[in-house]
Amino acid sequence: RIREFADEDPIFELRIDGFAFDQTRYCNAVTHYPMQVASRNEVIRLTRLDGCIDDFYPVLKNQALLTPSEGQSQQIRIEAEDDSGNRSILEFRTIRQPAQRDFRAVCDSTALIVDNRRPFSHTAGEASVHIPAGVFYEPLFFSQSSRPAQFAAAPSVAVLSPLYSILDYDTPLHTAATVTIRAYVPQNLQPHTTLGFVRKGKVSYAGGKYKNGAVTLSTRTLGDFCVVADTVPPRIEPRFKAGEPIRTRSITFRLRDNFSGIGSYTATLDGEWILLERNPMQGTITHTFDDSRTPKGRSYTLQLTVTDNCGNKTVWKRTITR
């Protein structure tokens, strides 16, 4: 719990005793998200953003804004309390400066503003973005630019467009925005084309499929994007010795992919579909034998097909003996 007082008058309280699963992302509005991402510390806003729910704020007077008159002094106290009742207090005094010392900014009539209560769309060059109402928690200045793609990419990843910047990666989104980038892609690469997300000079898989000359992606992360193609199929590594009788109740495979990650997998024994259990943390899949369907002392044809998120496929087919 965090409380704020101005001259002993409570003007703000944040209290989160629990919330529904679908309210989880409102935590990005409770915090100052860019500062929190940059510092890896919890940074709490002592106000409520327009797009945040009221449930977390039992006390909120005038959005907790300080509005003293010229020359007026106020005593501010901030209390932070953990779940065990331990409390820290910060106190300081503020004084309203003369009006001539107030900050004044020159209005930029060319600036684009995203109203968080209304949908927003923008196209610049080959990149466009659509932001539905309610995606952002507050109005934002919109920025979009492009530049040559100069970053470290794996040799197996082909970069097929300039780099397009749409706002920043530390802009929190409550729901998804849609990013579309047009690019010429050779026909043989089109089934394997997607969007890459670039941060700190490295490209990672973002998603989306190439269709009608463009890649479209639904995303909760904005920042730097480019069109890329990945043509390297995933690797299948059996965790048992192929060709030797299998004496265990189960068999395990390790799946690896160079860029986009594993998209799907399926397996058959003598043409009959079998159940696989995936362990994403270890990058493995496991099949446990059913003695009634696959008795011991017989040989079977096992076929495992693995496809990555860019449509590259690997087939592992062997005869195994129980």
Q: What are these regions, as identified by a protein language model?
A:
Residues 80, 304-306:
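Conserved structural position at the C-terminal beta-strand
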Residues 3-66, 263-288, 293:
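Exoplasmic/lumenal beta-rich domain surfaces
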Residues 102, 108, 112-117, 147-194, ...:
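Proteolytic processing hotspots in large secreted/extracellular or virion-associated proteins
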Residues 1, 231-235:
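Proline-centered linker/hinge motifs at extracellular inter-domain junctions
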Residues 180-184, 250-258:
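Short edge beta-strand/loop segments characteristic of extracellular beta-sandwich folds
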Residues 66-72, 219-221, 291-299:
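Surface-exposed, short loops/turns at beta-strand junctions within beta-sandwich domains
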Residues 169-225, 264, 273-274:
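Proteolytic-maturation and junctional protease-sensitive modules
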Residues 75, 83-109, 315-322:
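Short beta-strand elements
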